[in-house]
Amino acid sequence: MSLTSMCITATAMCCVTLAWSLHRASRWRSWAVTAWARPRCSEAWWACCRPAAAASTLAGQELTGSKSYERVAAGVGFVPQGRMIFPYLSVEENILSGMQGAPAAPIPDYVYEYFPVLFEMRRRKGGNLSGGQQQQLAIARALVSNPKVLILDEPTEGIQPSIIKDIAKALNLLKKERGFSLIVSEQVLSFAMAVADRYLIIEKGEFVHSEVRETVDRERILRYLTI
């Protein structure tokens, strides 16, 4: 996946310019972006906002200006900040909504294997789940579209630490089993370091630092994140 020459104008005082690429053949299959302006980056990758200028492709397919269902069909999965599940639909119906446009099929077994609480609560309304359970539901809904790239925006927001660890473990196993790349926009450093192979730091709208898992300097990253 590549994103080049992008300028996102979030407010009159904020312009973020990025140029980057994620190669499927690369050993860096999981990226974490942290620090200032994270949400706008995730929105731009998903194309929820309209960059002033951008070129976005996935596996050679042009995604710039495409509609959400076209991006899903192309292989982009998105788990938005705040989860945005359907509160009045059951857990099962929420997951099935992610399969719209795909060949008719039951919910894949691996979804309930990695998120067993969703099977236990499959008849319960999504709005009645805890924050951590809703986050697992949002991830499951994105996974059933069989994405090539899965983008998560602030996945740990409002979730208790024990559930955060469970989600990190599930994502690490799933990306190996399902073969997708992972992009995480996150403020909880421990989660980012648990799931990512490479870390990018944004400060004042620009990438200012990049590290890989094997040589990561946690203290240096923390200095960027200290207010």
Go through the PLM ranges and name each one.
Residues 31-33:
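The feature captures the beta-strand-to-loop junction immediately N-terminal to the Walker
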Residues 46:
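Helix-to-loop junction immediately C-terminal to a conserved catalytic motif
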Residues 62-83, 108, 120-124, 216-222:
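ABC ATPase NBD coupling module
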Residues 89, 129, 142-143:
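ABC ATPase signature
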Residues 144-148:
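A short, proline-enriched helix->beta-strand linker immediately N-terminal to the Walker B motif
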Residues 150-154:
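Catalytic Walker B motif of ABC-type/P-loop ATPase nucleotide-binding domains
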Residues 165-178:
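Helical segment within the ABC ATPase nucleotide-binding domain
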